[in-house]
């Protein structure tokens, strides 16, 4: 279990950041934090993971940038753990596809989580009944017009400065297809 220290929330107040309603002081399992990060884009989950893996968010983003360099991501720089807009936080479709391909091929837990249309986080001292979280990738939700039965997930992202972004993959007749789009109109 990881502790949700108050530092994980400091930069997020009044930003409109996506959340999984994790509270300062709450103890949350690593799996639930990964689900909160990957399903509803929980910014506090990203920071909690960062602060429990490294001594600081800056230290964690240094690790992110080292991994990006090792993967050959030449047009990427991370300056925060959650992906909200920052001057020195950027990437390209090609680089995000590289990262997604790496995660899909290497981590079963990643594949298991990104395909979920929803997830029930375990109960905690702050949420005695647990917390239900819902995926922002509507291709995974059979109740929407966007549903695509071959879709296996990955991640949506939406910022005024970046537009609508989507990293997605599908499996069809033994072949995996991966696509990353960025900058789609907001309307």
Regions of interest found by a model, annotated:
Residues 1-94, 104:
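Active-site-adjacent loops and short helices of periplasmic peptidoglycan-processing enzymes
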């Amino acid at each position: 279990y990881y502790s949700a220290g108050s530092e994980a929330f400091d930069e997020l107040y009044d930003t409109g950041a996506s959340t999984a309603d994790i509270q300062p002081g709450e103890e949350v399992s690593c799996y639930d934090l990964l689900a909160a990060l990957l399903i509803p884009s929980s910014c506090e989950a990203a920071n909690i993971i960062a602060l429990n893996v490294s001594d600081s968010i800056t230290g964690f983003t240094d690790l992110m940038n080292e991994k990006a360099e090792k993967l050959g991501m030449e047009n990427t720089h991370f300056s925060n753990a959650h992906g909200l807009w920052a001057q020195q936080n950027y990437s390209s479709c090609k680089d995000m596809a590289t990262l997604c391909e790496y995660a899909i091929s290497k981590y079963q837990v990643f594949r298991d989580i990104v395909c979920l249309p929803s997830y029930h986080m375990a109960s905690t001292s702050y949420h005695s009944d647990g917390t239900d979280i819902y995926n922002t990738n509507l291709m995974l939700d059979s109740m929407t017009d966007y549903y695509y039965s071959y879709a296996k997930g990955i991640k949506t992202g939406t910022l005024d400065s970046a537009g609508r972004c989507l990293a997605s993959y599908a499996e069809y007749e033994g072949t995996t297809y991966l696509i990353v789009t960025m900058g789609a109109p907001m309307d």
